[in-house]
A protein has these predicted regions:
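Compositionally biased P/S/T/G-rich terminal and signal peptide-adjacent segments
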Residues: 1-31
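Amphipathic alpha-helical segments
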Residues: 32-54
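Ser/Thr-rich, low-complexity intrinsically disordered terminal regions
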Residues: 52-76
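Core dinuclear metal-dependent hydrolase active-site scaffold
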Residues: 91-164, 236-308, 374-423
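Active-site environment of divalent metal-dependent phosphoester hydrolases
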Residues: 121, 143-144, 174-180, 204-208, ...
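Active-site metal-binding motif and surrounding structural segment of the metallo-beta-lactamase
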Residues: 130-133, 145-200, 302-319, 331-335
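Metal-dependent catalytic neighborhoods of phosphoester/phosphodiester hydrolases
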Residues: 176-191, 207-221, 324-328, 348-352
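Long, structured stretches of catalytic cores involved in phosphate-ester chemistry, encompassing
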Residues: 303-375
């Protein structure tokens, strides 16, 4: 098999490891490097005919993307003294500047209430761009049975009844509660929605740590890659750390991918999450997905107060995810929890990170209690909460997950649901 680095000049320095990034994409890691060696690697690429496509620096983290027969992405992180060189043969170029588009809609963020009748997770965020198209994040679990239809109807409603246009669909990672309903939409509702591009970076289904992940993750990754590959009209952008891309009037910066976890173990599949910082209408929204301990270390070490934002999606549904320090640095006025009230209440005393995020915020919102609509730029007091649409089927939940609750608790939860439903 041809070595992808045969046609890419590489600095004369021993590597600390070579990583299979998936789909023919590979990465070389060099430790004990300097910024001068980063510049040398860039010069080698340029002298070999690679064209500088994009450059973006964050504090003392330097990133350049070059294009030739393959895409070469090179970045150096001073805090780690580490240089990474990624060779990507399959990605599509992204927009490096804001798109020239109509100004016909209010830029708005929604935390969507996924159907939690049978499941306590899932995550779907939608951002309406100023031209009325959407950038959306993740989707819902297979047990949110009707959410493929609910998501399309929601986007249609906020498109003025027109066929929704998704300018970009981003996936943090390939757990079923984040991708399953997207797959159903593409396979069964393709004529009802236009999807221009998908943005993601997943590890291979046969990753070196895949034996920790279980058969379900293997099957979901295989299905996702097949469905996306067969959707030939959808552009596929493979994201790498430090890249800054634009979708309509929205700016995104890639903060972390599974490539940054290497050479450490990715036993916890949540560490495969790609984290994004979005800037919209001058305000920042941080989406860490389900980022966990290893990803958290990467972002704290590299970015510090660059993580400051106006709105933060709390990692991993408020279960064990990013650290309390992550939320101190984010210091967001609005915290979003893609979880049910039940699980939120269970985790609150256990998770210092949740308590820190809430203590710092002026407001926080739990997805199961109703879709939250946040006009951008974010201003405290302008968030609208929609009536609650779904409620737990406790018999079904017990049969699936063996979660059992007292009659008193179930009655209390139902009474609270009725208040939210009728508000």
């Amino acid at each position: 098999m041809k070595n992808i680095f045969d046609d890419i000049p590489v600095i004369k320095k021993g590597t600390s490891g070579r990583y299979d990034c998936s789909k023919g994409c590979e990465m070389l890691l060099f430790d004990d490097c300097t910024n001068a060696e980063y510049n040398l690697q860039c010069s080698l690429l340029e002298n070999a005919g690679f064209i500088l496509f994009d450059e973006h620096n964050i504090k003392e983290n330097y990133h350049r993307t070059y294009r030739s027969a393959v895409t070469a992405h090179v970045y150096y992180c001073e805090s780690e003294k580490a240089l990474r060189l990624v060779a990507d043969p399959n990605t599509t170029p992204y927009s490096t500047k804001p798109e020239n588009c109509a100004d016909t809609a209010k830029t708005t963020l929604w935390q969507f209430e996924v159907d939690h009748t049978l499941i306590d997770c899932g995550m779907f965020y939608a951002v309406r761009c100023k031209d009325g198209s959407f950038f959306v994040i993740d989707s819902a679990h297979m047990y949110s049975v009707n959410d493929d239809t609910r998501i399309i109807e929601f986007l249609k409603k906020h498109s003025g009844g027109k066929k929704p246009v998704v300018a970009g669909w981003f996936f943090s990672h390939c757990h079923e509660d984040h991708v399953a309903k997207f797959l159903d939409i593409v396979e069964y509702h393709r004529s009802e929605i236009d999807i221009e591009a998908v943005y993601y970076n997943f590890p291979a289904a046969d990753h070196r740590d895949a034996h920790y992940w279980g058969e379900c993750n293997y099957a979901m990754t295989e299905r996702f890659e097949r469905v996306v590959r067969e959707a030939t009209d959808i552009k596929k952008i493979n994201l790498h750390t430090g890249q800054r891309f634009y979708v309509r009037n929205l700016e995104f910066v890639v903060l972390c991918t599974h490539e940054d976890v290497f050479p450490h173990s990715m036993e916890d599949f949540n560490n495969s999450s790609t984290a994004l910082m979005m800037t919209a209408e001058g305000c920042k929204v941080l989406f860490p997905g389900d980022a966990s301990a290893e990803s958290d270390k990467v972002m704290l070490r590299r970015y510090g107060d660059y993580l400051k934002c106006d709105v933060v999606q709390v990692s991993h549904h408020g279960h064990s995810g990013t650290s309390p320090e992550f939320y101190r640095l984010a210091n967001a006025e609005c915290a979003l929890f893609a979880v049910t009230q039940i699980k939120f209440d269970e985790e609150y005393p256990r998770q210092e990170a949740n308590r820190v995020a809430i203590d710092l915020a002026k407001e926080y919102h739990i997805a199961s209690n109703g879709t939250a609509e946040i006009p951008l730029p974010y201003v405290f007091g302008q968030t609208k909460i929609y009536p609650d649409e779904t409620f737990e089927d406790f018999n079904g939940i017990f049969n699936l997950w063996c979660y059992e609750y007292s009659d008193e608790m179930k009655q209390k939860l139902y009474e609270e649901f009725l208040k939210r439903k009728n508000r």
